[in-house]
Amino acid sequence: MRVVVIGAGVIGLSTALCIHERFSPVQPLHMKIYADRFTPFTTSDVAAGFWQPYLSDPRNPQEVEWNQQTFDYLLSHIHSPNAEKMGLSLISGYNLFKEEVPDPFWRNTVLGFRKLTPREMDIFPDYGYGWFNTSLTLEGKSYLPWLTERLTERGVKLFHRKVESFEEVARGGADVIINCTGVWAGALQADTSLQPGRGQIIQVEAPWMKHFILTHDPRLGIYNSPYIIPGSKTVTLGGVFQLGNWNELNSVHDHNTIWKSCCKLEPTLKNAKIVGELTGFRPVRHQVRLKKKQLHFGSSSVEVIHNYGHGGYGLTIHWGCAMEAANLFGKILEEKKLSRMPASHL
């Protein structure tokens, strides 16, 4: 079985690994990964890697399960020898609001979810309500190299190649194509639901910051209010979500907005040294596109599994989506097996 995965962000690499781990013991797989960007130049490398879905219920109820599966998978690795290389760690902190809001659907997934006390709220005088919980961080700059190493150990080949069409890959001999091209998926097949959600972050040295602080303002929308997420070596400052903006250059205006708002939220950051600044595009869609489809090119056909449109929560949902993609791959194998069986003469 010849399999080509297009895309080498967290979705592409994790999907490739999940499928290879599950099916290579029972079905010889010749797997290749094509991408024009590999770590450290993917959107996943820009992400702080904090596990937290959006606050609102997803349109597709399956996404709740995929988020849960990802958290459980990562939590099972938290004390493993691989945790450090994966960039995986526990982190506690705050979600802050101007006024009371309903509890999120993931309140029973994270650890120790509770409402903030009046004394805790005194620490954040600009906010009137909040939550505290323990979650996970999974830093893409570590996790993607770890996934890549696991795949190469299994004999998966990675190629720096820009794919122009599914037909090009199909005519190259692929039996199954797995489309994990993120925000660029529309270049392979029109998808009017897919848009870039531009984000910009500042990375600082602030080792005294131990807790995440995420603020939320419904008037501004998701990711447009300040957030602070400590990592293993640096702290990520953010607060930009610009739908439809394809500008990949860092913006001075956005830099100033992020810096001022984060320093107001946590005044000690004024003393932090800025060590990096990055811009990336979240693949925004009304819901994740995770489905299989057969495409025909003349007399030939190829099976395609689409897995893209994860917005700003790709690392939060990636393993659950990889497991579902593997389920779809298993159905393709079963269908191909049945199609090869001789017809019954009973």
From Swiss-Prot:
Binding residues for D-dopa: 52, 282, 312
Binding site for D-serine: 223, 227, 282, 312
Domain of life (superkingdom): Eukaryota
Organism in which the protein naturally occurs: Cricetulus griseus (Chinese hamster)
UniProt region (Active site lid that may open upon substrate/product migration in and out of the active site and close to increase the hydrophobicity of the active site, to make the hydride transfer reaction more efficient), positions on chain: 215-227
Reactions the enzyme catalyzes: a D-alpha-amino acid + O2 + H2O = a 2-oxocarboxylate + H2O2 + NH4(+); D-alanine + O2 + H2O = pyruvate + H2O2 + NH4(+); D-cysteine + O2 + H2O = 2-oxo-3-sulfanylpropanoate + H2O2 + NH4(+); D-dopa + O2 + H2O = 3-(3,4-dihydroxyphenyl)pyruvate + H2O2 + NH4(+)
Keywords tagged on the record: Cell projection, Cytoplasm, FAD, Flavoprotein, Oxidoreductase, Peroxisome, Phosphoprotein, S-nitrosylation, Secreted, Synapse
Name assigned to this protein: D-amino-acid oxidase
Regions that span the bilayer: none
Subcellular location per the Swiss-Prot or TrEMBL entry: Peroxisome matrix; Cytoplasm, Cytosol; Presynaptic active zone; Secreted
Keyword Secreted: yes
Function: Catalyzes the oxidative deamination of D-amino acids with broad substrate specificity. Required to catabolize D-amino acids synthesized endogenously, of gastrointestinal bacterial origin or obtained from the diet, and to use these as nutrients. Regulates the level of D-amino acid neurotransmitters in the brain, such as D-serine, a co-agonist of N-methyl D-aspartate (NMDA) receptors, and may modulate synaptic transmission. Catalyzes the first step of the racemization of D-DOPA to L-DOPA, for possible use in an alternative dopamine biosynthesis pathway.
Span(s) of short sequence motif Microbody targeting signal: 344-346
Top-level enzyme category: oxidoreductase
Keyword Flavoprotein: yes
Pfam families: DAO (PF01266)
